Amino acid sequence: MPVFNAGKHLRLAVLSIINQSFKNWELIIYDDGSTDQSLESLADIKDLRILIVNDGQNRGLAVRLNETIDMARGRYFARMDQDDISYPERFTKQLTLLKNDLTLDVVAVSAITISESNEAMGLLPCPVTHESICAKPWQGFCFAHPTWMGKTEWFRRFRYAIPGPYFCEDQELLLRSFATSRFGGIPDILFAYRIKEKRNLPRVIKTRWTFLVIQCRYFIHALKVIDCILSIMVFAALVSRDVWWELIINTNSQRPNISAKMIIERAKWVRLINSIFLVSNTKLNEEHISNVPLLK
């Protein structure tokens, strides 16, 4: 879990890992030069499975991810962002899938999206098969990065590109590896993905442009000119939509998804976040945390 100025959300993210039904894990929290004293919110959490690393430098997400991959001691490596929430069964279900299908390298899960104030907003479904995940590489991969769990050896073989592409490290890695890897997805909602309430349009466009350049280089090298053209068309359509939303729609007034499935998932989310808040408001010490031996 790379951390940079995580603010108020870091504690809940860490507690959601402590709350996992699968207990044999290690959590590496790598602070990337935070200036907001993010780690202070974890001061009372005494858990031998948690390692906090802070070298005082700001080197970027891709560098920190590669460093944690090298430090990891388990057979499997899981991603987690500093402001998201993992559901209690996330690790258990991902490990079960990976162990039942040894051909899989990385698996992701479906998620709900949540606001800065922890309100459930919408659904982020994950395709189940490798073929559906990778059906349209020119369109990108619907495979939420912070929900990944995969073989540690896979992450070490492919690694994140350095310097990291602007806010699209995950898409670059998937594009570079999908032809010789196998991905899988779990349709169950096992994650809460936090979205910013105010979009940073210049950053969004720069991210899309960066990935377009990566795509075109990849497709041209692979002699897939049509895919390159399709990537350009997708880029144009997405940027047009981004600008339209910025100019016409007041995104802060958007209402949450109210589909039947969302109503059910929102009820589950309310129960989960309330249980995490209950733990968060309790002073944590060795008596509240079950210290399990670290992975070997």
What is each stretch, according to the model?
Residues 89-121:
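Conserved donor NDP-sugar-binding/catalytic core segment of glycosyltransferases
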Residues 54-72, 93:
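Glycine-rich, basic loop-to-helix element that forms the pyrophosphate-binding segment
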Residues 9-11, 34-44, 85, 89:
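Acidic helix N-cap motif at the loop->helix transition within catalytic regions
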Residues 70, 87, 109, 123, ...:
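Conserved nucleotide-sugar donor-binding catalytic segment
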Residues 215-296:
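Membrane-interface aromatic/basic loop that binds lipid-linked glycans or pyrophosphate carriers
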